[in-house]
Every structure is written in structure tokens, then in C-alpha cells.
Design a protein with these regions (language model features):
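Acidic beta-strand-loop-alpha-helix segment within the catalytic core
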Residues: 1-75, 118, 127-140
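Oxyanion/phosphate-interacting regions
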Residues: 54-60, 74-140
């Protein structure tokens, strides 16, 4: 996943093999929180969070969140810069596949609101709700 305006490139090729390319060198995503351990940070696609999303923010005790566009949301969770990304159904399978691999290969998880695994090859290709958790959040 490449974010040209941020000049950030993330990739993965198997379990424990998620990286960010920094100065032309791969840096393994360490999954260590880069924020205060007392504050749970979430990333969102909107500043106007729907009640269903706010319910999960309350459940997980999210202290603050930041709006961010693109699949970069998955990458910043995998890198430990944010703890969570929670979204309602809106994207198709191809919108999340690369981010899904990067998060899971960094030790994080992606599940739906009912804690089911995210599966691919659905007839309409639409995703369900998503809860993306970084490894540091799962371990914490």
C-alpha cells in the first residue's frame, strides 16, 4: 500500500513479514505502541462517527481518533501508530485485501462486529463491518 502524499509504502509477504519501506530499506513492523499506553487511539474514515461505531469506541475505551483516508488506516494500525480502525459495511473485498494481509502478518486481527473472520469470494464482494486491531492492542 503506497500513500504518495505521505511518502509511505507498506507491504507484506507472509506471517511476521509486514514492513514499511523507509529510506529505501525495509523496516519490520514492530507492533509496539507508539502512543501513550493509557490512551487507546483509533483511526476513522470520517469525523462524523455513526452511533454503531461510537458504541465500539466506548466499549474499547477509545481516548481519541483521527480521520484518515485510504487503506493507510490498516497500515498505521499494523505499525502501532493507532490501536483500532472500526467501520461499518461500505467497502468491497478488493478495497481491504492488501491492508488485511499487512495487519494480520504484523500480528493484528480483522474481524466483523460479531467477531467473525473476514472471508473473500462473496457473491456481491461487499465486506461486512470491520474491527481492525493492532497486535499491541490484542496483547495489551
Amino acid at each position: 500500500i503506497y500513500a504518495p502524499d505521505k511518502k509511505r509504502l507498506f507491504y507484506s509477504y507472509g506471517p511476521s513479514n509486514s514492513f514499511e519501506l523507509i529510506d529505501k530499506r525495509p523496516k519490520r513492523l514492530a507492533n509496539k505502541r507508539k502512543n501513550n499506553v493509557d490512551t487507546i487511539k483509533a483511526v476513522s474514515y470520517s469525523n462524523n462517527l455513526k452511533p454503531e461505531i461510537l458504541k465500539f469506541h466506548k466499549k474499547f475505551k477509545v481516548g481519541n481518533y483521527k480521520k484518515m483516508k485510504s487503506s493507510l488506516k490498516f497500515c498505521v494500525v499494523a505499525a502501532g501508530e493507532f490501536d483500532l480502525y472500526i467501520t461499518e459495511p461500505r467497502a468491497c473485498e478488493w478495497d481491504i485485501a492488501a491492508g488485511h494481509a499487512i495487519v494480520e502478518h504484523s500480528g493484528g486481527s480483522i474481524r466483523d462486529f460479531n467477531d467473525n473472520e473476514i472471508l473473500y469470494g462473496k457473491p456481491n464482494f461487499k465486506n461486512q463491518s470491520l474491527i481492525v486491531k493492532g497486535k499491541s492492542f490484542l496483547d495489551g
